[in-house]
């Protein structure tokens, strides 16, 4: 429990994810710290996934909307998309955001944390495939699951 005096210190020093990314970007631009380059470039995309999860938004719907495409994609995203054979989907915002999140995880998480998250993701995929026949005729969901599995496999 926080004492009365420490509660104020906690409130003054707490930073949400959006502010953290802004600070990392500011710090990277000012000092050129190479270890923060990926966080600066890809943090905003990962923020979209974080916010969707925090607010219980559905990620797998409306992924391939024509009006939901990015005109410009970071070179790191393009390289990763080529590696996992999803290059033609890299400009879709949700695919781009998911790739951003996983590239950041590979760059900044320990092997043990990566393994833990990979197992959790694989468990989710197994749960999704349990009722695969229910959505087998939904082309968008089926395509997203294929793309999602390819992206996650690189962890």
Task: Please place each PLM-identified region on the residue numbering.
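Single conserved hydrophobic/aromatic residue that forms the stacking wall/gate
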Residues: 1-10
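Polyanionic, low-complexity intrinsically disordered segments
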Residues: 19-44, 48, 58-155
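Flexible, active-site-adjacent loop/turn segments at secondary-structure boundaries
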Residues: 10, 57-58
């Amino acid at each position: 429990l926080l004492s009365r005096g420490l509660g104020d210190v906690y409130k003054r020093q707490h930073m949400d994810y959006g502010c953290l990314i802004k600070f990392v970007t500011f710090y990277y631009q000012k000092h050129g710290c190479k270890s923060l380059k990926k966080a600066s470039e890809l943090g905003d995309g990962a923020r979209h996934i974080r916010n969707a999860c925090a607010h219980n938004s559905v990620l797998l719907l409306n992924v391939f909307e024509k009006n939901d495409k990015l005109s410009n994609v970071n070179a790191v995203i393009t390289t990763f998309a080529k590696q996992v054979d999803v290059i033609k989907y890299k400009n879709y915002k949700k695919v781009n955001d998911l790739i951003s999140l996983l590239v950041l995880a590979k760059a900044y998480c320990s092997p043990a944390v990566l393994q833990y998250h990979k197992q959790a993701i694989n468990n989710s995929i197994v749960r999704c495939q349990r009722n695969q026949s229910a959505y087998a005729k939904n082309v968008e969901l089926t395509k997203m699951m294929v793309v999602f599995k390819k992206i996650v496999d690189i962890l």
